[in-house]
């Protein structure tokens, strides 16, 4: 074991025996009082109720019936309400986790002045510290008590102990009873509290994770609090050092006699709360309870300071971000204004260019459009001329009655019976006279023989004049009915070629060239 032990006077603590009878102790007693590592500290809270019983069992053992002067102190277990020290003490797990906060360091010589019980089997070690009395002689048999706890879990109650090598003990004057200020290296997970000035409040550590609201949660009695092993602080001595702790080290409250040195913060808080300031050990129950309450308030104060510090840092960070974003926004606005100005300038230049281009190119376009229209008109005129030249080549059409002219020689065959019945269109000429006139020309009727005509009268000359006048019209009338086929039977409104009277022919001298033949 690496624990440094301070020898006890064996002739007074263990008279007549060279070993410690551990028959009344069992494995659970040592485990319940063991100081577990950081990741097992939550087991300690459930097992702290057995710590006072274990500590009292060392002195209630039958071997120790003869009490010495050192054992005349009060060994009564504290009240249930204050079974544990506060979680913000040096033995708790509420050490400041911030690496920026300086931590109080004590010299390793403090460990030499105190003895320790150590469990070297598994997890922990139990150290029992006792201040050396200058008038008591040093006995090498005291070292044998350090080996009793090492084999308590694996051996019978009675154990053979072997002496351990001891480190040299610093020399003290016979009348020197006060404890000198020392510096001790502690691990960063141990609770360290600093007394700082108001301007240093920003550098307070973060809120301890093990702070609780209950009165006895996370606290231990000063006399039942086991200090940590001196080997662990030696390995972690690289932490920062400060010179003004806010709370008194818990191992200083474990002494059974001697003066009690409290920090200025604790004294001020005790006075403010109306409690008396304890000056010597051991502490009474009332003093212990008051001191516990004061330490808890100091810890809450530290937590509040840390919370304010974090909030202040957060607000400062936000303010810096706001300033940065504001500057970036202003720069972006300037860029936007520059781009808008450039855009307006480019638009003006574009309008000027469009005006110039329109003024120079519009005239040729108009001329080209005029030339195109002229060409189209010329092409249309040429087409009309060509079409007009082709019109005389077409067959001639009559513009008046649209009648068909035929040779007069074919007039004799007008009423020839056709071999096949057919229909023909009838054309009527308004200027050619009525149909009855033509009919009269075709069928002239001579007056009866009894008519007397005066020579040279109008009645005598009328037939000849009429026939001469209608000669040309008869030819025209016959052409209107070319190849006309008359039906055999017609109605009353029609005209049939079959007359009701017998056909008769009458020859009349109408002229040398006039011949009328009816068939």
UniProtKB/Swiss-Prot annotation:
Kindly list the places in or outside the cell where this protein is found, as annotated in its UniProt entry. Answer: Endoplasmic reticulum membrane
- Effect listed in the UniProt record for changing residue 423 to A: Loss of proteolytic cleavage
Which residues lie in Low complexity bias regions?
A: 210-223
In what way is this protein post-translationally modified?
A: N-glycosylated. Ubiquitinated by HRD1/SYVN1; undergoes 'Lys-48'-linked ubiquitination, followed by rapid proteasomal degradation under normal conditions. Upon ER stress, SYVN1 E3 ubiquitin-protein ligase dissociates from its substrate, ubiquitination does not occur and CREB3L1 is stabilized.
Indicate the segments forming the bZIP domain, all copies. Answer: 290-353
| Motif stretch (S2P recognition) | 392-395
**Which residue ranges are recorded for the region named Leucine-zipper?**
332-353
Q: Which GO terms describe its cellular component?
A: cytosol; endoplasmic reticulum; endoplasmic reticulum membrane; Golgi membrane; membrane; nucleoplasm; nucleus
Q: Where is this motif: S1P recognition?
A: 423-426
Q: Where is this site: Cleavage?
A: 426-427
Q: GO terms for biological process?
A: endoplasmic reticulum unfolded protein response; extracellular matrix constituent secretion; mitotic G2 DNA damage checkpoint signaling; negative regulation of endoplasmic reticulum stress-induced intrinsic apoptotic signaling pathway; osteoblast differentiation; positive regulation of collagen biosynthetic process; positive regulation of transcription by RNA polymerase II; regulation of ossification
**Residue numbers spanned by region Disordered:** 200-259, 449-519
Alphabetically list the UniProt keywords: Activator, Developmental protein, DNA-binding, Endoplasmic reticulum, Glycoprotein, Isopeptide bond, Membrane, Nucleus, Signal-anchor, Transcription, Transcription regulation, Transmembrane, Transmembrane helix, Ubl conjugation, Unfolded protein response
Report biased composition (Polar residues) as residue ranges: 236-246
Query: Do you know which Pfam families this protein is assigned to?
Result: bZIP_1
Give the knockout phenotype: Mutant mice are born at the expected Mendelian rate, but show growth retardation. They exhibit severe osteopenia, involving a decrease in type I collagen in the bone matrix and a decline in the activity of osteoblasts. Osteoblasts show abnormally expanded rough endoplasmic reticulum, containing of a large amount of bone matrix proteins, including COL1A1 and osteocalcin/BGLAP.
What is the topology of this protein in the membrane according to its UniProt annotation?
Single-pass type II membrane protein
Lineage: superkingdom: Eukaryota
Q: Where is this region: Basic motif?
A: 292-321
The conditions that induce or repress this protein are given as: Up-regulated in astrocytes residing in or close to CNS lesions, such as cryo-injured cerebral cortex and stab-injured spinal cord. Up-regulated by ER stress in astrocytes (at protein level). This induction is accompanied by increased proteolytic cleavage that releases the N-terminal transcription factor domain. Induced in astrocytes upon DNA damage. Up-regulated by BMP2 and RUNX2 in calvaria osteoblasts. This induction at the transcript and protein levels is accompanied by increased proteolytic cleavage that releases the N-terminal transcription factor domain, possibly through mild ER stress.
Kindly state the subunit structure of this protein: Interacts with SMAD4, the interaction takes place upon TGFB1 induction and SMAD4 acts as a CREB3L1 coactivator to induce the expression of genes involved in assembly of collagen extracellular matrix.
The entry assigns this protein to a family as follows: Belongs to the bZIP family. ATF subfamily.
Q: This chain belongs to which protein, by name?
A: Cyclic AMP-responsive element-binding protein 3-like protein 1
Per the record, the gene is: Creb3l1
């Amino acid at each position: 074991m690496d624990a440094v032990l301070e020898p006890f006077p064996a002739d007074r603590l263990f008279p007549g025996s060279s070993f410690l009878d551990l028959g009344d102790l069992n494995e659970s007693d040592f485990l319940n009082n063991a100081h577990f590592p950081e990741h097992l500290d939550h087991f300690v809270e459930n097992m702290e109720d057995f710590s006072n019983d274990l500590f009292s069992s060392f002195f209630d053992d039958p071997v120790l019936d003869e009490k010495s002067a050192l054992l005349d102190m009060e060994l009564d277990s504290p009240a249930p309400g204050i079974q544990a020290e506060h979680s913000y003490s040096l033995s708790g797990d509420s050490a400041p986790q911030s690496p920026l906060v300086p931590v109080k360091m004590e010299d390793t010589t403090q460990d030499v002045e105190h003895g320790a019980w150590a469990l070297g089997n598994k997890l922990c070690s139990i150290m029992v510290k006792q201040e050396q009395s200058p008038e008591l002689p040093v006995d090498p048999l005291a070292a044998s008590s350090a080996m009793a706890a090492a084999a308590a879990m694996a051996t019978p109650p009675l154990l053979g102990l072997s002496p351990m090598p001891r480190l040299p003990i610093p020399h003290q004057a016979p009348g020197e009873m006060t404890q000198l200020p020392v510096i001790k290296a502690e691990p960063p997970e141990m609770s360290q509290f600093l007394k700082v000035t108001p301007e240093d409040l920003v550098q307070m550590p973060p809120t301890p994770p093990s702070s609780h609201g209950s009165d006895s949660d996370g606290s231990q009695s000063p006399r039942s609090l086991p200090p940590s092993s001196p080997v662990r602080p030696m390995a972690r001595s690289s932490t920062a050092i400060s010179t003004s702790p806010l709370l008194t080290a818990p191992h200083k409250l474990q002494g059974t006699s001697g003066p009690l040195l409290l920090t200025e913060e604790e004294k001020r808080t005790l006075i403010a709360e109306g409690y008396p300031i304890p000056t010597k050990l051991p502490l009474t129950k009332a003093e212990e309870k008051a001191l516990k309450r004061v330490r808890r308030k100091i810890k809450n104060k530290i937590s509040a300071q840390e919370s304010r510090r974090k909030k202040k840092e957060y607000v400062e960070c936000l303010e810096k971000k706001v300033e940065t974003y504001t500057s970036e926004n202003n720069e972006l606005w300037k860029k936007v204004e520059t781009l808008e100005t450039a855009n307006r300038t480019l638009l003006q230049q574009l309008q000027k260019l469009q005006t110039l281009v329109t003024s120079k190119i519009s005239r040729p376009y108009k001329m080209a459009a005029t030339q195109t229209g002229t060409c189209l008109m010329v092409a249309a005129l040429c087409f009309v001329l060509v079409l007009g030249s082709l019109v005389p080549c077409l067959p001639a059409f009559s513009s008046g009655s649209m009648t068909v002219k035929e040779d007069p020689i074919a007039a004799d065959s007008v009423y020839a019976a056709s071999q096949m019945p057919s229909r023909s269109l009838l054309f009527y000429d308004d200027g050619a006279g009525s149909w009855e006139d033509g009919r009269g020309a075709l069928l002239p009727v001579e007056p009866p023989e009894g008519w007397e005509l005066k020579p040279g009268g109008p009645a005598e000359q009328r037939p000849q004049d009429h026939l001469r006048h209608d000669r040309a019209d008869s030819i025209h009338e016959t052409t209107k009915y070319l190849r006309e086929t008359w039906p055999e039977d017609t109605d009353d409104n029609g005209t049939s070629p079959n007359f009701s009277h017998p056909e008769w022919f009458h020859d009349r001298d109408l002229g040398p060239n006039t011949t009328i033949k009816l068939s």
